[in-house]
From Swiss-Prot:
Gene: psaA
Binding residues for chlorophyll a': 680
Keywords: 4Fe-4S, Chlorophyll, Chromophore, Electron transport, Iron, Iron-sulfur, Magnesium, Membrane, Metal-binding, Oxidoreductase, Photosynthesis, Photosystem I, Thylakoid, Transmembrane, Transmembrane helix, Transport
Gene Ontology BP annotations: photosynthesis
GO cellular component, one term: photosystem I
Main subcellular location of this protein, as a coarse class: membrane
E.C. number: 1.97.1.12
Protein name per Swiss-Prot or TrEMBL: Photosystem I P700 chlorophyll a apoprotein A1
Assembly mode: The PsaA/B heterodimer binds the P700 chlorophyll special pair and subsequent electron acceptors. PSI consists of a core antenna complex that captures photons, and an electron transfer chain that converts photonic excitation into a charge separation. The cyanobacterial PSI reaction center is composed of one copy each of PsaA,B,C,D,E,F,I,J,K,L,M and X, and forms trimeric complexes.
Binding site for chlorophyll a: 688, 696
Subcellular location: Cellular thylakoid membrane
Note accompanying the cofactor annotation: PSI electron transfer chain: 5 chlorophyll a, 1 chlorophyll a', 2 phylloquinones and 3 4Fe-4S clusters. PSI core antenna: 90 chlorophyll a, 22 carotenoids, 3 phospholipids and 1 galactolipid. P700 is a chlorophyll a/chlorophyll a' dimer, A0 is one or more chlorophyll a, A1 is one or both phylloquinones and FX is a shared 4Fe-4S iron-sulfur center.
Length: 755
């Protein structure tokens, strides 16, 4: 850490412009007002596509970085408003149309529902019996479990929260308008990274975690303790009573003096043992609820709060003390990295695409990590035995993660095309990566080929041996074994090493690594996962699909500005169909096209992950516990024997498990049957755009226009075929939508039918 003399670094002034942009409803009412050519109105049908493509492309509205920054900042508030309205709607459904109170009284036998379909012409068939005399649509968002963990005990509290969400949405809409039209920050404010880090670390993350820890200690833990003890929700004191009446807390946790200030005295006097009743270090899962101990969670959030509040005081702002990000980056050099990170400060403070690329890649990776943790270390009471919710949350976080990572590559390529400055990046890490991009991409290509042929070869070998009646020559746990020895070693390490690495913790992080079965109400919430040859094989398919996705996306970023084929690619922009007539073989080389192709491989990668997860959990984890202690898994442990060849995946996973969705007609699951059928249609519809030539459609359109002219009903706006890129965009959107909805219907119909 260094200090800076005052004269070298002037005080940062937080400055705003007053009334920079007038509020004009008249202007906003004109479609395309942000672009001079679009504002003239439509001449051809291409206008509507360009309107959508450019509405949020602020770079095309203005080249002024300050104005672009303000638009992004304002849009963030608009986005938050949408999120609050969306959340408010879900809480309102919980308040008005749900069986939350009934579920709270019996979370083992009653299923969550927060939507009741109105009878118009027979749709009421969708209202299934979820237990407790309630009929409605089964929900799988995990919100009921989250609400219980937070200490919500009745529908009125949900209604109040829903109203609060609308108030917050209104505030965000106001803030978005105010900070663009009335008091708009100057560019220096957006580029003041040290202040931003301090506020985000100490404020959002630090105080946010502290507030949540406070809520858990004062509201959630006491209410959950009473619920776990069997106290009816109606007899539990209201949340504010635990805060305003110290006697209630004293009754539950007598070792702390629950006064206005006396409660925090042990914290500052380091007498932390007083808090041991509600800030625990138990580890593992609560056997009653199958979830992480709420008292462990409160402990975690308090510790995180302290860390982030400290972290929020590390960076140098007005007081000349602390770290400078620019200095840290410029000092960050290794023996083989030339100028190291020099220039990256300028990159990340002048290109929001570069900043966004990193953020999307990080948050996408984090979402995938969340998916892996949420089932193994279920955070909310009774959610571990709600298998439909578990599969939904895993699938959701995997898709979101994959989409965000592709978005990271998209904005990385946009940065390279629009914002990259060779003068700033001289022999730094970015420049050096770009200069040896051929070595990177060719090696990555070799890895993809190796993984592809070997991983697929395992399955082809097994299909062949099975067809020849030679099971002893198959790769399997009973034939030629390919045991995942490193994964098994990590599992045993996590189980056994806990005694020496964390002596105060009562159990390892999750029974999934080893230990006892956690069963709630006769259903397995979590138990040790045995890995074998089938997992080893599908793992290498995961490795292949991930590496191919990375190959496509990284190639798109590294060759976005230039390539041997098109040295001046940067001049053509982020998206272009081909490099003009007379340049054969230059189609589908733009940065945009790499994102387009990357999306398909991302879809492949995530699909195989969620299929693997779904089948593995049904085969080896989820099921019922018999009175004698034996476990009946949903698919009876068939993963190890069936997932080792392609025929097994087709027959015992896709075909066998689609029984529920295919046979759903005439039941409350019939909507999933229609979605399954309809989503297949949407997926097939996408192929019409993907296996297509623009000229074919233009010729067809001209014939149709000729017929309209003959009949004197020709439109004023000239019809035009979609451009090549528009066609690809429509194609990939429907491909992903169709594929994802098909999978959604397939999973949910099965898990809802299984109960």
């Amino acid at each position: 850490m260094t200090t800076t003399p005052k004269e070298r670094e002037p005080k940062v002034k937080v400055s705003v412009d007053i009334d920079p942009v007038p509020t004009s409803f008249e202007k906003w009412a004109k479609p395309g007002h942000f672009d001079r050519s679009l504002a003239r109105g439509p001449k051809t049908t291409t206008w509507i596509w360009n309107l959508h493509a450019l509405a949020h492309d602020f770079d095309s509205h203005t080249s002024d970085l300050e104005d672009v920054s303000r638009k992004i900042f304002s849009a963030h508030f608009g986005h938050l408003a949408v999120v609050f309205v969306w959340l408010s709607g879900m809480y309102y459904h919980g308040a008005q149309f749900s069986n939350y109170s009934a579920w709270l009284a019996d979370p083992i036998n009653i299923k969550p529902s927060a939507q009741v379909v109105w009878p118009i012409f027979g749709q009421e068939i969708l209202n299934g019996d979820v237990g407790g005399g309630f009929e409605g649509i089964r929900i799988t968002s995990g919100l009921f479990h989250l609400w219980r963990a937070a200490g919500i005990t009745n529908e009125f509290q949900l209604l109040c929260t829903a109203i609060g969400g609308l108030v917050m949405a209104g505030l965000c809409l106001f803030a978005g308008w105010f900070h663009y039209h009335k008091r708009a920050p100057k560019l220096e404010w957006f580029q003041n990274v040290e202040s931003m880090l301090n506020h985000h670390l100490a404020g959002l993350l630090g105080l946010g975690s502290l507030a949540w820890a406070g809520h858990q200690i004062h509201v959630a833990i006491p209410i959950n303790k009473m619920l776990d003890a069997g106290v009816p929700a109606a007899q539990i004191p209201l949340p504010h009573e635990f805060i305003l009446k110290p006697a209630l807390m004293k009754e539950m946790f007598p070792s702390v003096d629950w006064g206005l200030f006396s409660g925090v005295v042990p914290f500052f006097t380091l007498d932390w043992g007083k808090y041991a009743e509600f800030l625990t270090f138990k580890g593992g899962l609560d056997p009653q609820t199958g979830a992480l101990w709420l008292t462990d969670q409160a402990h975690h959030h308090l510790a995180i709060a302290v860390l982030f509040i400290v972290a929020g005081h590390m960076y140098r702002t007005n007081w000349g003390i602390g770290h400078s990000i620019k200095e840290i980056l410029e000092a960050h050099k290794g023996p083989f990295t030339g100028e190291g990170h020099k220039g990256l400060y300028e990159v990340l403070t002048s290109s929001w695409h570069a900043q966004l690329a990193i953020n999307l890649a990080m948050v996408g990776s984090l979402s995938i990590i969340v998916a892996q943790h949420m089932y193994a270390m279920n955070p909310y009471p009774y959610m571990g035995i709600d298998y439909a919710t578990q599969i939904s949350l895993f699938t959701h976080h995997m898709w979101i993660g994959g989409i965000f990572i592709v978005g990271g590559a998209a904005h990385g390529a946009i940065y390279m095309v629009r914002d990259y400055d060779p003068a700033v990046n001289r022999n730094n890490v970015l420049d050096r990566v770009i200069r040896h991009r051929d070595a990177i991409i060719s090696h990555l290509n070799w890895v993809c080929l190796f993984l592809g042929f070997h991983a697929f070869g395992f399955y082809v070998h097994n299909d062949t041996m099975q067809a020849l009646g030679r099971p002893q020559d198959m790769f399997s746990d009973t034939g030629i074994q390919l045991q995942p020895i490193f994964a098994q070693w990590i599992q045993s390490l996590h189980t056994k090493a806990i005694a020496s690495t964390a002596p105060y913790v009562g159990a390892s992080v999750s029974p999934i690594f080893g230990g006892d079965v956690v069963a709630v109400g006769g259903k397995v919430s979590m138990m040790p996962m045995v890995l074998g040859t089938a997992d080893f094989m599908v793992h290498h398919i995961h490795a292949m699909t991930i590496h191919i996705t990375v190959l496509i996306l990284l190639k798109g970023v590294l060759f976005a500005r230039s390539s041997r084929l098109i040295p001046d690619k940067a001049k053509l922009g982020f998206r272009f169909p081909c490099d003009g007539p007379g340049r054969g073989g230059t189609c589908q080389v733009s940065g945009w096209d790499h994102v387009f192709l990357g999306l398909f491989w991302m879809y492949n990668a995530i699909s195989i992950v969620i299929f693997h997860f779904s089948w593995k959990m049904q085969s080896d984890i989820w099921g019922t516990v018999n009175p004698d202690g034996t476990i009946e898994h949903i698919t009876g442990g068939n993963f190890a024997t069936s997932a080792i060849n392609i025929n097994g995946w087709l027959r015992d996973f896709l075909w066998a498990q689609s029984v529920q969705v295919i046979n759903s007609y005439g039941s409350e699951l019939s909507a999933y049957g229609l979605l399954f059928l309809g989503a297949h249609f949407v997926w097939a519809f996408s192929l019409m755009f993907l296996f297509s030539g623009r000229g074919y459609w233009q010729e067809l359109i001209e014939s149709i226009v000729w017929a309209h002219n003959k009949l004197k009903v020709a439109p004023a706006i000239q019809p035009r075929a979609l451009s090549i890129i528009q066609g690809r965009a429509v194609g990939v959107a429907h491909y992903l939508l169709g594929g994802i909805v098909t999978t959604w219907a397939f999973f949910l119909a099965r898990f809802a039918a299984l109960g």
